[in-house]
Amino acid sequence: MVKINFDGTLFSKEKKFGIGMVVKDDNGSVLASCTKSLSQAYSAVEIESMTATMALSFAHYIGITQAILEGDSLAMIKALKEDVHSLAPTSLLIEDVRMLSQNFDQLLYSHTKREGNSVAHSLIRY
């Protein structure tokens, strides 16, 4: 099973944000990575939600079927693990992630501290 680390960062001075994701095998070797910079600013929760969505889309595109989606936003990971539905804008973004999770045979969610997500975070700054 591979691990998909994802992270999103707001560059408030430039009023843009960056997203990054890294797919690693169970030995920790990088299989694939992807970054993107967008010019519109969003809230931190929106950025993390959109990054998770893009990470799952990317993983599905490259043929991943079993994965652990790991991020450093505890609120985001908790929201994905809970089966709570709401019409709040951020909840709709969480629903997008849940819909994409149906493309996987097995998908687990895991929280890591920022230090554990350093590769994805560093990619954003590149």
Predicted segments with their positions:
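Primary recognition of RNase H-like, Mg2+-dependent phosphodiesterase/nuclease domains
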Residues: 1-126
